[in-house]
Amino acid sequence: MIRIGPSGSTTQAKSTLEAVDIVADMGLTALEVNYVRGARASEETTRKVGAKAEQRGVTLSAHAPYYVSLNSPRDEVRDSSVTHIVETARRCQWLGAPFFAVHGGTYGGKESPEATDGVVERILTVQTRLEEEGIVGVKVGLETTGRPSAWGTPEEIGSVAEQTDIVIPVVDFSHVHARSGGGLKTTEDFQALVDWALEVSDCQLYCHFQSIEYGEKGERRHLPVDRWDPDFRLLAPVLRQIPCDVHLIC
């Protein structure tokens, strides 16, 4: 099944609880709860959102804080980044959300292999903390990034997934398109990326799609889907043929 919905509360909603109703009333079936400025929502409120979503047939995911930086040269930033991920996972468990998206941050002045090793180390710490704190059934979705300065190519994310038990990729098609200088030009380009993600994630696809403005340094800003860059009409037939669940955030 393909489930489609927005990230964050709509402009009409005063709360995430209201956003669930608005999304469902629009005929959409997915919502990404934004914790981009901190995962601080109370357990009571979060469980109410999860119950409302289940009642209305909306599948939830979440987005971790933007200030996660797993390769920061500062110990306290790396440690707080781990905590941000753990706290997002905790709220996903309360929500009944099976996964959430997180950006890994920059390379921290390191080459790709060393930076990837650093991400593995931090994710293994997250994995241990989740086990110790009884947070189960939630996957950490490492999101593909839109700038060469940001850690998060498909190859890097795949390497972390291979070395940990809790990681799946979050394929942001616009980010991949921008980082590659407009590389998603054909249905075959999208198919190859989707095939990779399904293999790494054991046949589940959590993805983002928007159009995007980009330049030599990658992404500049997100744009409405109907700017057709990348072209959703090339991706649609690929999504229709996927034999497992798709969680598409637009």
Report the location of each language-model feature.
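Active-site acidic/histidine proton-transfer and metal-coordination neighborhood
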Residues: 54, 71-171
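Hydrophobic faces of well-ordered beta-strands that scaffold small-molecule active sites
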Residues: 2-8, 31-33, 60-64, 100-102, ...
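Active-site beta-loop-alpha junctions enriched in small/polar residues
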Residues: 7-11, 34-38, 65-69, 105-107, ...
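Charged helix-capping and loop-helix junction motifs
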Residues: 44-51, 78-85, 116-121, 154-158, ...
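N-terminal pre-domain/capping segments
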Residues: 1-87, 168
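Acidic (Asp/Glu)-rich catalytic clusters
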Residues: 20-27, 40-61, 87-96, 124-136, ...
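Active-site-proximal flexible loops/turns
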Residues: 12, 16, 39-41, 70-72, ...
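Gly/Pro-rich active-site loop or hairpin
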Residues: 113, 151-154, 177-245
